[in-house]
């Protein structure tokens, strides 16, 4: 089966934004205008196509990134057909993992900002994630019809708060109730949308007289930005030559793909204005799979290898999401980077060292499935029938192996104990939690060895609430949930050298392992580093991995309060062995003993997670809010003014933030809002550390 759309006409994009910026509504409009849905679904009716989990429809927020495909021929029907694969990503901070994994497999993104709220905390988080993966993006300033809408203020914030280089390619005609349409600066034409056809029809007109001067000035800035794309455009521009619309588009495209600029558009998705022009911009400025660099990975023999986005290269794909479907079982969402995959093919998973057969292939339209026989380079699809694949695994041609770079997932910062309400549900709960953990790498399940309780950990209170909710709905398990626990860590402050010796002489063969370790602190975020400093074979090399393993096991149980130890480097620099009695087990125990003893002497300290918190409050409550933040050991880092009042930016220990939503509501009569995300670990003050240690010992 030949390709229906050339790969140059593919656009794999994500829609990313702060919660409530209107992301899902924008996606719904895209599906409406591209003809996928014939009736617009509204989020506030709980009818949005992209929000297909029950909890999403109840809460009005997007939790999982649904993928969908649509086709676009341009606003005026003049384009050849483009295939746009859209991933709608959640804007709530507890689900940043969904955003992270979407960005890893996208080629471009549309960042949606609220014209009133502007750049909000989650916008910064998502923008940083897009920077990390080098994703070219354009910005759409939504909700231009709302009271307090200010397009140029948002453009300014993209520059000052996100460090982007925004280039407006449109200006709004009016704002708030007076928002009528936009001026297309390329063609210097006003675009008016027809309300009676839900914005399906539009007309072009002259720029309103009172806007001509502003439009000329902003167009000049846009043309200059485009001219910087190449020497010949710059030369033509400097010599006073007029750049054609096509040349401006080409220049803007080159610079957007290089992540040098961000084209900015505006509109109101809810009022059906501006979304088709944004789709045109997706085609004009965002990359196709062939515009992105070849994907890089590790090939046979550990050498770096790369794959071009084309059908005749060997097959390679990345599994970026696992979802359980009540009808077909496990769906594995994949992004195909190269080659062709047909249903029935066998693929190799180098991460798990397993071959698997692809049962069926489906392309998703939110939660509707369309079965396809094959997928090609650039496609996003879901495979049914894969048994042992987790998020971030590579799938490739068994004859031409490549391992693509894995995704990095944040460590959970909050834990709660859960137990089923009836003993009979114990096994069901275990199965449910393991399935949910397979879907979501930022969610962990473990059993506390001392208490025997099941502990679940995640990125925030809402994250865990939704997990417990899904357990009840999808698996029929009712659970009691304990009080939230903070995920503390431990580290050391000074370097020590420590001996560990494990000797057992019982009749017959004994046990003998002997090591010397140098244990030293690393900078925050350094993790764990093991260095083999053995010379002359005083510890045989077959026992060295066992020493490392023993240390890693001991790292999980810190010496102060049993929390994981982070940011340490351990060097194995000496030791001895016995020809007969030495074994891997003996060296593992010796390594573990040496680390435990050494950590005690290395000035261990307790680390606590610090959250970055932003509170938006009406001015009259500001004193109370700041006072409360100070009482919670928070440090205020700055304040901004917004139409809703004041934005207070601060850092607060997570342990002080439980129940904050309720307290903030009562202090401000429900008028303030806040958002928070994990920022860093810092050393806990002595009185906090003492209390935590005392509690863990008791």
Curated annotation (Swiss-Prot):
GO terms for molecular function: GTP binding; GTPase activity; guanosine tetraphosphate binding; translation elongation factor activity. GO terms for biological process: ribosome disassembly. The keyword Metal-binding does not apply. Keywords: Cytoplasm, Elongation factor, GTP-binding, Nucleotide-binding, Protein biosynthesis. It is found in: Cytoplasm. CDD domains: EF-G, EFG_III, EFG_mtEFG1_IV, EFG_mtEFG_C, EFG_mtEFG_II. Its main location: cytoplasm. Residues 8-290 form the tr-type G domain. Pfam families: EFG_C, EFG_III, EFG_IV, GTP_EFTU, GTP_EFTU_D2. SUPFAM superfamilies: EF-G C-terminal domain-like (SSF54980), P-loop containing nucleoside triphosphate hydrolases (SSF52540), Ribosomal protein S5 domain 2-like (SSF54211), Translation proteins (SSF50447). Gene3D superfamilies: 3.30.230.10, 3.30.70.240, Elongation Factor G (Translational Gtpase), domain 3 (3.30.70.870), P-loop containing nucleotide triphosphate hydrolases (3.40.50.300), Translation factors (2.40.30.10). GTP binds at residues 17-24, 88-92, 142-145. GO terms for cellular component: cytoplasm. Catalyzes the GTP-dependent ribosomal translocation step during translation elongation. During this step, the ribosome changes from the pre-translocational (PRE) to the post-translocational (POST) state as the newly formed A-site-bound peptidyl-tRNA and P-site-bound deacylated tRNA move to the P and E sites, respectively. Catalyzes the coordinated movement of the two tRNA molecules, the mRNA and conformational changes in the ribosome. Belongs to the TRAFAC class translation factor GTPase superfamily. Classic translation factor GTPase family. EF-G/EF-2 subfamily. This is Elongation factor G 2.
């Amino acid at each position: 089966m030949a390709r229906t759309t050339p790969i140059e006409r593919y656009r794999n994009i994500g829609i990313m934004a702060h919660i409530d910026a209107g992301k899902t509504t924008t996606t719904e409009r895209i599906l409406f205008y591209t003809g996928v849905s014939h009736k617009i679904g509204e989020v506030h009716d709980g009818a949005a196509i992209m929000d297909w989990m029950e909890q999403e429809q109840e809460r009005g927020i997007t939790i999982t990134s649904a993928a969908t495909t649509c086709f676009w021929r341009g606003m005026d029907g003049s384009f050849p057909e483009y295939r746009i694969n859209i991933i709608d990503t959640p804007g709530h901070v507890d689900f940043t993992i969904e955003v992270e994994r979407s960005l890893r497999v996208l080629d471009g993104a549309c960042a949606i900002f609220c014209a009133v709220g502007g750049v909000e905390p989650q916008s910064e988080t998502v923008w940083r994630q897009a920077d990390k993966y080098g994703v070219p993006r354009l910005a759409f300033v939504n909700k231009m019809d709302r009271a307090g809408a200010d397009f140029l203020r948002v453009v300014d914030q993209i520059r000052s708060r996100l460090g982007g280089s925004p280039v407006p390619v449109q200006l709004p005609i009016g704002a708030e109730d007076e928002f009528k349409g936009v001026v297309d600066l390329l063609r210097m034409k006003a675009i008016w949308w027809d309300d009676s056809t839900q914005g399906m029809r539009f007309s072009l007109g002259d720029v309103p007289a009172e806007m001509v001067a502003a439009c000329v000035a902003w167009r000049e800035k846009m043309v200059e930005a485009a001219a910087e794309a190449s020497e010949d455009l710059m030369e033509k521009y400097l010599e006073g030559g007029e750049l054609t619309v096509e040349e401006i588009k080409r220049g803007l495209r080159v610079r957007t793909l290089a992540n040098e600029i961000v084209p900015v558009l505006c509109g109101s998705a809810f009022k059906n204005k501006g979304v088709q022009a944004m789709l045109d911009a997706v085609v004009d400025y965002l990359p196709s799979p062939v515009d992105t660099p070849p994907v890089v990975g590790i090939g046979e023999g550990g050498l770096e290898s790369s794959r071009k986005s084309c059908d005749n290269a060997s097959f390679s794909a990345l599994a970026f999401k696992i979802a359980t479907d009540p009808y077909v079982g496990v769906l594995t969402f994949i992004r195909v980077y190269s080659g062709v995959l047909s249903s029935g093919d066998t693929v190799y998973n180098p991460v798990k060292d397993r071959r698997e057969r692809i049962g069926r292939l489906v392309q998703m339209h939110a939660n509707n499935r369309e079965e396809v026989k094959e997928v090609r380079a650039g496609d996003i699809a879901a495979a049914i029938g894969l048994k042992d694949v987790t998020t971030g695994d590579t799938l490739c041609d068994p004859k031409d192996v490549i391992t693509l770079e894995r995704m990095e997932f944040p460590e959970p910062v909050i834990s709660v104990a859960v137990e089923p309400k009836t003993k009979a549900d114990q096994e069901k709960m275990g199965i449910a939690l393991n399935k949910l953990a397979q879907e979501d790498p930022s969610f962990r399940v473990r059993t506390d060895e001392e208490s025997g309780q099941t502990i679940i950990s995640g990125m925030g209170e809402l994250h865990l609430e939704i997990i417990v909710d899904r357990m009840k709905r999808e698996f029929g398990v009712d659970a009691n949930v304990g009080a939230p626990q903070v995920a503390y860590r431990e580290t050391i402050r000074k370097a020590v050298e420590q001996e560990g010796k494990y000797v057992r002489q019982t009749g017959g063969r004994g046990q003998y392992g002997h090591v010397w370790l140098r244990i030293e602190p690393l900078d925050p975020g350094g993790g764990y580093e093991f260095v083999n400093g053995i010379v002359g074979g005083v510890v045989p090399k077959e026992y060295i991995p066992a020493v490392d393993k023993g240390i890693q096991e001991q790292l999980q149980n810190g010496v102060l309060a049993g929390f994981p130890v982070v940011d340490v480097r351990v060097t194995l620099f000496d030791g001895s062995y016995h020809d007969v009695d030495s074994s891997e087990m003996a060296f593992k125990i010796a390594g573990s003993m040496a680390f435990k003893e050494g950590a005690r002497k290395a000035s261990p300290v307790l680390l606590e997670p610090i959250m970055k918190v932003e509170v938006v409050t009406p001015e009259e409550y500001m004193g109370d809010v700041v006072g409360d933040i100070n009482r919670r050991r928070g440090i205020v880092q700055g304040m901004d003014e917004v139409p809703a009042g004041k934005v207070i930016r601060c850092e607060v220990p997570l342990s002080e933030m439980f129940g904050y939503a309720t307290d903030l509501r009562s202090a401000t009569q429900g008028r303030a809002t806040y958002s928070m995300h994990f920022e860093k670990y810092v050393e806990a003050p002595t009185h906090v550390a003492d209390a935590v240690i005392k509690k863990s010992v008791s």
